[in-house]
């Protein structure tokens, strides 16, 4: 069974580094264009997460795949936090905190995927990339809470938390032991 790839790459998509700056349906402020279609990259990453997380190798077919990889790894980080939450409201607070926490971007020490991501070309691109990744993190965390928490008992679903120990591409956005 092959890994799932992003279908959202258009020829006129703007790039930051070698990562696609894709439109998203977001309530958070950031550089991403507003998405008008039903499905955006965050929906795609959440939908394909359970299948893609099992892959140790992932062939990058376009720049949108790099965005998909980042969100997939971020979902893994979110699940580590959400499994410890007792309610959806606590989960939303954790996701907000994780989304705005300082994080490394491509080209910085501590970023685990420097081999496959190009660093920003200049200071302006650096700021756009950081803002875009933060916008993706905030939106992903919020939407993931909707999927992970069972509306009947307000607890995290075991069908999501069972993926906490899985590492996509043998990588993690957090440091070793976190």
From Swiss-Prot:
Q: Where is this cross-link: Glycyl lysine isopeptide (Lys-Gly) (interchain with G-Cter in SUMO2)?
A: 14
Location comes to: Cytoplasm, Cytoskeleton; Cell projection; Nucleus
The alphabetized UniProt keywords are: Acetylation, Actin-binding, Cell projection, Cytoplasm, Cytoskeleton, Isopeptide bond, Nucleus, Phosphoprotein, Ubl conjugation
Q: What does the function comment of this entry state?
A: Component of the Arp2/3 complex, a multiprotein complex that mediates actin polymerization upon stimulation by nucleation-promoting factor (NPF). The Arp2/3 complex mediates the formation of branched actin networks in the cytoplasm, providing the force for cell motility. In addition to its role in the cytoplasmic cytoskeleton, the Arp2/3 complex also promotes actin polymerization in the nucleus, thereby regulating gene transcription and repair of damaged DNA.
Q: What is this protein called?
A: Actin-related protein 2/3 complex subunit 3
Oligomeric form and interacting partners: Component of the Arp2/3 complex composed of ACTR2/ARP2, ACTR3/ARP3, ARPC1B/p41-ARC, ARPC2/p34-ARC, ARPC3/p21-ARC, ARPC4/p20-ARC and ARPC5/p16-ARC.
Secretion signal: which residues? none
Gene name of this polypeptide = ARPC3
Per the similarity annotation, which family is this? Belongs to the ARPC3 family.
Question: Positions modified as Phosphotyrosine?
Answer: 47
Question: GO biological process: any one?
Answer: regulation of actin filament polymerization
Residues the record lists as N6-acetyllysine modifications: 56, 61
